[in-house]
Amino acid sequence: MARSVWKGPFIDGYLLNKAEKARSSGRNEVIKIWSRRSTIMPQFVGLTFGVYNGQKFVPVLVTEQMVGHKFGEFAPTRTYYGHAADKKAKRK
């Protein structure tokens, strides 16, 4: 179920402060965040965020197409190795 329109998009408060500091400093450094649940806002376009996936920080460069999505969508938490092949089929 989608979030109620009257509530507005969810974003952790500290995230806006971090983004503003990064914009004012002018340096293009990775902003480390743990908030995968926060919505990407238009103010974040052009910034690089390091989104934590439980193991490491995945660098995510925010573009205009990402606005409205969640940070967690761009940092997968699970690695898929494929299904194990049948050992009998390999022998033949």
Curated annotation (Swiss-Prot):
GO molecular function: rRNA binding; structural constituent of ribosome
UniProt keywords, alphabetically: Ribonucleoprotein, Ribosomal protein, RNA-binding, rRNA-binding
GO biological process: ribosomal small subunit assembly; translation
Pfam families per UniProt: Ribosomal_S19 (PF00203)
Keyword Cell inner membrane: no
Superkingdom of source: Bacteria
GO CC list: cytoplasm; small ribosomal subunit
Family the UniProt entry places it in: Belongs to the universal ribosomal protein uS19 family.
HAMAP family reported for this sequence: Ribosomal_uS19
Function in brief: Protein S19 forms a complex with S13 that binds strongly to the 16S ribosomal RNA.
Protein name in UniProt: Small ribosomal subunit protein uS19
Species of origin: Rhodospirillum rubrum (strain ATCC 11170 / ATH 1.1.1 / DSM 467 / LMG 4362 / NCIMB 8255 / S1)
